[in-house]
Amino acid sequence: MMDLAEKLEILADSAKYDVACTSSGVDRPGRHGALGSSAAAGICHAFTADGRCVSLLKVLYSNVCSYDCSYCVNRRSNDRPRATFTPRELAELTIGFYRRNYIEGLFLSSAVLGTPDRTMELMIEALRILREEYHFNGYIHAKTIPGADPMLVEKIGRLADRLSVNIELPSETSLTTLAPDKKKTAILRPMGQIAVQSAQSKKEMVLYRGAKPFAPAGQSTQMIIGATPETDRHIMDLTEGLYRKYSLKRVFYSAYLPVVEDRRLPALHTAPPLLREHRLYQADWLLRYYHFSARELLTEDEPNFDPYLDPKCTWAVRHPEFFPVEVNTASRAELLRVPGIGPKSALRIVEARRVQSLGMAELKRIGVVLKRAQYFITCKGKAATRGSRAEIAGALLDPKAFSVGMQQLSLDDFVPKALPDAAPAVQRLEARGMAADVAARTVRQEALQCLTKRM
């Protein structure tokens, strides 16, 4: 008979591949006489809409799955330890952690235990016990199981603060190939239901005092990138459509980490495309807060993001006709197109110039990143800097693409090592035997020359 601690260890570990909230990845057990523990028992962090960081218990209800998705560590044919909570076990575990001040909420997902309806019924019962018997008022993020009855989606939406339905892969073709048990329509249907009921609930909350909220923190989704051949342009078009049609709060991107051997997937030794994931998040930010469109960021000729430039700088290099921008007269929308100017600094510029004309000194105090912005703006009609093309290119290159750390081989022996999110070209040269720092310098020089020619 498996005890609760064993179940927690298995089901917290099985939940770590879901990126809708983040974990540290540390697995240092507690010690007698010491305060605290960083054991990998499912404690992770998420950020609320107002910027607060909350600690969540991140677990699966069960990792016993009736589906056989090729990319999933919990797939039916994979030989691994299996466990399932009972609704009361999960509720008592959550409330126990909450009372000890370990967590502020719960992130709950599950493998498909038998059928989607059966899985959702068990998850709902666990949340009902938490809310109604223990009067738990903390944050709950629940994953909706595609294919479940709409009535069950409504029930879980009344108990959870946020819902999410994972879109899994960027195209229906990839979904059919790697996850034949899942259907695109079964994923999109609950997304549409959640969007409609969430909007309706907000109206009811205004009109009726006793109205019950439905997923008041909205919904999100997650997709795996790097396991299938879709371009970044395809992914951003999909993302833009999801935000527009389903009013999503977030789309999360998960760089594919090979965990199972399958001829349809990248080999087990393949490094996850972390830099590509980073570029997608940067582009996602541009869609949500900078008012870019997906088709502005990528073209048919260049359907993937530049590994050496962030998407905003890439757009600026492609559109010299837009610059320079006069900071004392430009609209907020125009300011947001300038590399080095973000939403907060753009708003501060608009407010500050009502009082006085702005120069470089004022922009620096406002928070503008002048290292990049100085090449794209004028202040009172004067260009801030007239750098050479090579100087401008050097200022725009993303240092993250050439990131190198130090790896300790022995007490006195340290060697440079390319970090996991360095550009693929750096990692390839290192794999061929070149020192990581030399590889980074070589790739940076080549990228600099290439960018200088484009400008």
Positions of predicted regions on the chain:
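A structural motif corresponding to the C-terminal lobe/cap of the Radical SAM core domain
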Residues: 176, 188-195, 226-311
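Residue-level signature of tetratricopeptide-repeat
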Residues: 352-353
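Long, highly charged, low-complexity intrinsically disordered interaction regions
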Residues: 264-336, 372-421, 454-455
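Flexible, acidic/Gly-rich N-terminal and inter-domain linker regions that tether
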Residues: 1-64, 369, 377, 385-455
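Conserved Radical SAM active-site core
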Residues: 1-67, 71-221, 226-229, 242, ...
